[in-house]
Amino acid sequence: MPILKLTPKERAVKSGATMIRDDSAFQKLGATLDNINVGSAKVCLEIKQEHTNGHGFCHGGVIFTLADATFGFACNSYNMKAVAQNCTITYISPVKKKDILISEAKKIKKFGRSAIYDVTVKNQNKDLVAIFRGHSREVGQNLFDE
């Protein structure tokens, strides 16, 4: 009987599920992986009281964590473990409790074991909240056996 190979989309979905299973920080964040494909991902988060800072806005670290998680799903979508080498974020506008954040990552360029991804974070009104750029490095291991 022939061995069935995963399609790239199936590989990305399985990679995302494997990461969620093993990522306690993502589980505690309360976000959802809404879409994943090869080199891209979409994660959503409703902002709750526990996400706010002393000014009553969403804490910048929460927004960074959301963007970083989205970047992580995108760069690990090939079933090759990848880690962040460098990440930067620019905050554009404040986020309030009950806002829904939509974070979307897209591969810009992959070269060898390294890659660059851009992530946009928007609110439910499609207002730009933050721009994140992540540089990843594959570490030479699979997330799961194929």
What are the roles of these predicted feature ranges?
Residues 1-146:
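Terminal targeting signals and extreme-terminal segments of soluble enzymes
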